[in-house]
Amino acid sequence: MSAVARLCSVGLLLVDLYTGKKIMYPGGNELNVAVYASRLGNESGIIGVFGSDPSAAFLQAVLQAEHVDYSHSRYAEGPCANSTVKIVNGDRVFTGHNNGGVTGMFPIEITAEDEPYITSFDVVSTSTYGRMHPQQVQKLCSLGVPVAYDFSHDAPQEMVDQLLPCVTYAFFSAADKSDVEIKRFIYACAEKGGHNVICTAGERGAFALVDGAMYRQEAEKANVIDTMGAGDSFIAAFLTTIEDPQKDRDVRAALKAAAVFAAETCTKEGAVGHPSPIA
C-alpha cells in the first residue's frame, strides 16, 4: 500500500514484561503509535532513546520489521524503559516500571539536526510518558507541524494547562468519568486554550471537540483479549486519517477509523505483537 500520511512519534521506546508468561513485548506510547501508523499504510518514524541492554536490539529489530524509521533516535548507557504487566479479565494491569530507563534519564531534546526531519512529516505524536520537558514540547509545536499529545489520565494539571494552548490535538483517557463529566472536561480544556480535545472512554467509545464541534464516537464491538495499545491505535488511526494530505479533512471518518482500529487491537495480545522470551 502506498503511503498516505507521514507520522513521527517522539518519546518512549519500551518493553512490556509479562512476567507471568516470561514473555516481553515491544511497547511505549510512541513506539505503538509509530508502528500502528505504518501498519495502516503510512510512512512513520520515531525519535526515542535506546539503552545498552539486550532490549535495545530487540526494539530495533521490531521497528525494522514494521518499517518504522529510527535514524534520528538516541543511544545511551543504561536499561531501556520497561514495565511489568499482568492481564486481569482481558484488561492490562501495570505492576511496576523502571521509571523510563534511559528515556527517563535522558529525555528527548529537539536539536537543529532533528528539525528538518520532523518538519518532513504531516503530524507528530508524543505523550506524557514520552518524558519530554514541557519546554521541549513547546519547541516541537513551534516547528509548524501539527502536534498531538496524549495526556493519558494522570498528567500533572500544571503540565496540562501549560501545553493545551500549544498542541494541535490533546488526547485524554477518561474511562473513569461519566459522559456528562467528559463533556464538561472537554469544554473546560477548550476554555484553557485547547484546540482539539479528544477523550477516549473504553467500551463507551470517545468524545471529541474538533474544529469547534462536539462529536460522539461509539466503540466498535470486539472479542477483547488484551486492551494494551487500544488508546495508541485510536490515536494513530485518527491522526493519519485527519491529517492525510491527500484527503479532505473529515472528523467523523477519522473517529470511525480510530474506533475500528482500536477494536481490532484489543483482539490481540501485546500492543503490537512480536512476543519474545524476556531477555
List each model region and its residues.
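Conserved phosphate-binding/catalytic region of the ribokinase-like
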Residues: S2-A3, K183-A279
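Active-site metal-binding loops of divalent metal-dependent hydrolases
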Residues: L12-L13, A175, S233
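Gly/Ala-rich phosphate-binding loop of Rossmann-like dinucleotide-binding domains
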Residues: S38-R39, C141, E243
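Conserved phosphate/ATP/ADP-binding segment of small-molecule kinases
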Residues: C141-A148, S152-R216
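Glycosyltransferases and closely related glycan-assembly transferases
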Residues: T119-S120, P134-V147
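Histidine-anchored nucleotide/phosphate-binding helix
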Residues: E30-R39
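Conserved N-terminal subdomain of the carbohydrate kinase-like
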Residues: V15-G20, N42-V123
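Positively charged, low-complexity intrinsically disordered leader regions
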Residues: M1-K21
